[in-house]
Every structure is written in C-alpha cells, then in structure tokens.
UniProtKB/Swiss-Prot annotation:
Localisation per UniProt entry: Cell membrane
Alphabetical keyword list: Cell membrane, Membrane, Repeat, Transmembrane, Transmembrane helix, Transport
Organism: Aeromonas hydrophila subsp. hydrophila (strain ATCC 7966 / DSM 30187 / BCRC 13018 / CCUG 14551 / JCM 1027 / KCTC 2358 / NCIMB 9240 / NCTC 8049)
Protein name per its UniProtKB record: Putative transport protein AHA_2450
PROSITE patterns with a match to the protein in the record: RCK_C
Keyword 4Fe-4S: no
Length: 561
C-alpha cells in the first residue's frame, strides 16, 4: 500500500495543522547561544514554508484559535488591569501611550511614504512590536465588517499583506528590542546595576537569589538560665526574638501544659519552646538558646508547616505596603510575590494590588488566619470553571457584535476587543471571588499558547504563497520600516521616561519591555542589571499594554482606510 503524504496534507486540514505545529514547535526549540527562536517564530516560519509549497488552510479553526488566545490574554491581564492606576500607575500608562502612539503614527507615515499595500502597515506594526494581539485586532476589525473596504480592494489580499508584514518584521522586532535595551544603558553611560541597587536601597529590595526555596523547620529547646536572664521578664514582642534569631516561638510547654503564645507571653526558665525557622536560622542560634537542652517531644513538635499561595483581595490591605502586614509577627514567612505572572523582587514597601499572589510558609492555622485577613488561598484544583469560561466567552462575542451608529458612521468593537474585555472582567472577578472563574495556570497557558499557535499556522499558510514575490518587491522596505518602528519608539519612550517622568533607568527599561509585552527583552534587562528589579517596571505596564496594543491594531486599519 502506498501512502501519498503530500496528498493527505492537501486533503486534511486537521493533519496539516498539527504537522505544521509539530515542526514549528520543534524549530522553536533551536538555540543560538542565549537566544532561542521561540514557538511563535518557529510556527510562523514553518507555516510560511508550507504555504510557499502550495498548502492551504481552509478550515475555520483559525477563528477559534485567535479568539481563545485573545480571551486568555484578557484573563491574565484582568487581576491587575484596574489596580495599575494606583502607585506609579499614571507613569506606566503615559509611558505605554507614548511608545504606542509613536509606533502607530510612524508606521502609518512609513506606509504612506513607501506606498505600501493595504494591510501591510498593520502587519509591520504588530511584527515590529512583537504583538500578536495587535495583529488579531487588525484582522478582526477587517473581517467583522467594522470598516468598509475601498472599491475593488480584495479582503484576502489585505489579510495576506498583514501576515507578510508581520512575518517579515517579527524577528526584527524581537532581536532589535533585545539589542536596544542591552546597549542603550552603555550609550547613555549608565551602570544599570548601580541604578538597580539605588532602587533597592530606597525601597528595601532584595533579589531572588537570596530567597528560600524550602520550608522552615521546627526544633524545640528547653529554656536555660542564660536565656531566661537575657529575656529578663520581657514579653516576646519586647524581646524581638524573630529579628534576633530568624525564628519565632510557635508553642510553649510549661508545667506539662502546651500553649500557643501571643506577643504578650513571657518565657521563663524551664519552659520548653518550639521554634519555627529556616535551617540556617536554627544553626545560627545564639549561645543562650543552645545552653538549654534540645528537646525531642512529639506533642511539642507536632505542627503542620505548609506553603500556600494567597491571593490579595481584601480592600483593607489593597494599597498598603507589604511591610504593614507584619508577617513575621504573625509567624509567617514570605517566599515570593507574583504579579502579572512575573515574580517580583522583595520590596518591603511594595504596594499591594488586587490579584497579587503571595507565597507564604508557616504553621497551617497561622497561614489560614493570614489568608482570611488579606484575601484567600488559591484553589488547589486542576479543574477549570468551564461554566464561567464559556459564559464570559459568549459575553465577549456579544460585546463584539454590538454596533453604535452616529449618523452615517457605524462603529463596533469586534470580537477581538469584545473577548479581551470579557477576559479582563473574568480575571478581575477571579481576583476578588475565589469560587468564580478559576482556571489552573497550566490550563490557561495551554489554551493561550495553542490558540496563538493555530492562529500563526493559518496566518503563515495564507501569507506563504506570495511571500517570495513580496520579498522581491517590498522586502527591503518592509524590513527597514520594521527596524525604525522597533527602535525609534523605544528611544522616544526612554527619553520621555528620563526627562519627563524622572523614572529610574532600571525601572524604565523594564517598563519599556512591558509596554512591548516582550518577556525575552525583560530577561536581557535583568541580566544587564544583574538584578530582577526591572521586573517591577515590566509588571507596571504589561497588563494595560496588552489592551492598548489590541486597540492599536483596529485603529491602524481605520487610519489606512
């Protein structure tokens, strides 16, 4: 039996889809030094190659792909989209607007100057900014009929131009941004590490390398005369045992009676105390503690130490500084703070926002009490709330279908913006109500990445058939335009941030990469600064940038026509 694999690919959209995905994702694993091609570039380039070989994708799967992707982008942005307007929020929003508007008008100007075909500007904008949401917004604005095409303008040719412009400039945008943020501090004669340390001193920050990646442990000691004399009748609060030892007193046994002490308790000679702390804290205990005998008492040591992820929700703590929680007095250890999927540097003055995730270790009941005070413990479940997911998805489609009429002008949001807004609402509600709209991080990442990959396959296959002709005709112009749109808005944003907003350069470069929603570039800034502090700036702009970039895709189509 003979199997014609090429014929099978031509006859089966499903087989073609997953063959391109498999080869593209494999290509995305290729590394050149510290640079990895990545899934988006790998799938897009593979799809372009298959498209050039004559393969076509006629299924409607593309629509499902881009809708899943943009909806998941909204869910990710939702918890912090509104809270970004708090501390430094106006700076981050203004910076994002400056970068985006500069890129938008520059792209339109270049497209008009070089007389590029309809749709090419949208592709150049999305590719140069490495923003798939911008491409999704542009294509959806065209497909949904929000804009009336000029006479004799073929929609498919406009869509193909978008895909080709995006494909030609995406790699330029990614590598270009990484190079700019890497060498801009040197050109500006700045030591990024010094600037990062300056912020660290001002805000009491520490880097991730100093954090504990393991649980605290429990050990028990009998209070000897030396320790009792040092305490001298002072309460636990007055003694400050945690600052002195790095451990806190979880239990006391006195005259055979077990008790959980509060800050007003006084330790006496002969007491047996259970101390909770990291192993090195026990090793470095003052000699006063070691003069007493270590105790191995099952009841005294029978404590359950847990690590939980607590989602910040309660208005009483939102907007307050982390240090105000007095975690150590509550017998809790902070392992990390995550915001917008980015692990933040330790900043005792960081202002808490709804949706922040605090990873806390400590005795189970203490951690539970803390969670009740500041929010809720993230659900330990691998089950997606599909009822909420599908309901908000439908809501997004309904929002996108609404049109407003102003005289002869009809305006609608389209599916992309509608789904993005519905996703933001679902993510925001999830940050405030633990039982609504839960999607496990792995499931959300799968839906987002798979939706993006399917969209890239469709875009690449459709654009691939004419990419060689476009390369010979306008390839150099498109690549040159992509270089300008990649670099100039970043330079304008940097100068605006330094001269007008007076931002610290380390935070500013992190914010610029967030405004471009480019995590690989943020890693470059972190490496140059030898610090994770730029992540503070990245998290400040990332959520709002995703929304603005989607809208920009729709707007640039409007500018062109």
């Amino acid at each position: 039996m003979t199997i014609d694999f090429v014929t099978l690919l031509h006859q089966s959209d499903s087989l073609l889809l997953f063959v391109v995905l498999a080869f593209g994702l494999l290509l995305g694993k290729v590394r050149f030094g510290n640079f990895q091609i990545g899934n988006t570039i790998g799938v897009l380039f593979t799809a372009l190659l298959f498209g050039q070989m004559g393969f076509e994708f006629t299924a409607t799967t593309e629509n499902v792909g881009f809708m899943l992707f943009i909806f998941c982008v909204g869910i990710e942005a939702g918890p912090h989209f509104f809270s970004v307007f708090l501390r430094d929020g106006i700076h981050y929003i203004t910076l994002t607007l400056v970068i985006l508007l500069t890129a938008l008008f520059l792209t339109v100007g270049l497209a008009k100057f070089f007389n590029l075909g309809p749709g090419m500007a949208a592709g150049i904008l999305a590719g140069s900014l490495t923003s798939t949401p911008a491409l999704v917004g542009a294509q959806d604005a065209l497909r949904s009929g929000l804009l009336n095409l000029p006479h004799q303008t073929d929609m498919q040719s406009v869509l193909d131009n978008m895909g080709i412009g995006y494909a030609l400039t995406y790699l330029v945008g990614l590598v270009g941004l990484m190079l700019v943020v890497r060498y801009l501090p040197s050109l500006a004669r700045l030591d990024l590490n010094t600037e990062a340390q300056k912020i660290a001193r001002e805000r009491g920050l520490s880097d991730n390398e100093s954090r504990k990646t393991y649980l605290p442990i429990i050990r028990a000691y009998r209070v000897g005369p030396e320790l009792a004399a040092w305490i001298g009748g002072r309460t636990l609060r007055e003694t400050g045992i945690y600052p002195h030892t790095g451990c806190y007193v979880e239990r006391i046994r006195r005259n055979g009676i077990l008790a959980s002490p509060d800050g007003d308790a006084v330790i006496q000679e002969g007491d047996e105390i259970a101390l909770v702390g990291y192993p090195e804290s026990h090793e470095k205990l003052d000699v006063n503690y070691r003069n007493g005998k270590e105790v191995f008492d099952r009841n005294l040591l029978d404590l359950q130490i847990v690590t939980e992820e607590i989602v910040v929700k309660n208005d009483a703590v939102v907007g307050r500084h982390l240090v105000e929680l007095n975690l150590t007095e509550k017998g809790c250890f902070l392992n990390r703070v995550v915001r917008s999927q980015i692990e933040m540097p330790f900043d005792r003055n960081i202002m808490l926002q709804k949706g922040d995730v605090l990873q806390i270790s400590g005795e189970k009941q203490r951690v539970k009490l803390l969670a009740n005070k500041i929010g809720f413990i993230s659900i330990h479940s691998q089950t997606t709330d599909l009822v909420a997911f599908t309901t908000f998805f439908v809501l997004g489609l309904l929002i996108g279908s609404v049109s407003l009429v102003f005289g002869q002008l009809e305006f609608g949001l389209g599916n992309a913006v509608g789904l993005l807004l519905a996703g933001i609402l679902m993510g925001y509600l999830r940050a405030n109500h633990p039982t609504v709209g839960y999607v496990p991080p792995g499931a959300l990442r799968l839906a987002k990445d798979l939706g993006l990959a399917v969209f890239m396959v469709s875009t690449g296959l459709k654009a691939g058939g004419g990419i060689l002709d476009h390369l010979s005709q306008v390839g150099a112009v498109v690549l040159f335009s992509g270089m300008l749109v990649t670099t100039l808005p970043v330079l304008v944003g940097y100068l605006f941030g330094v001269w007008v907003l007076k931002m610290n350069p380390a935070l500013l470069l992190g914010a610029i990469t967030g405004a471009r929603t480019c995590a690989p570039a943020m890693d470059v800034v972190n490496e140059a600064a030898n610090s994770s502090i730029p992540a503070l700036g990245y998290a400040g702009t990332y959520a709002v940038a995703n929304v603005m970039l989607t809208l920009a895709g729709s707007f640039i189509i409007g500018f062109w026509f």
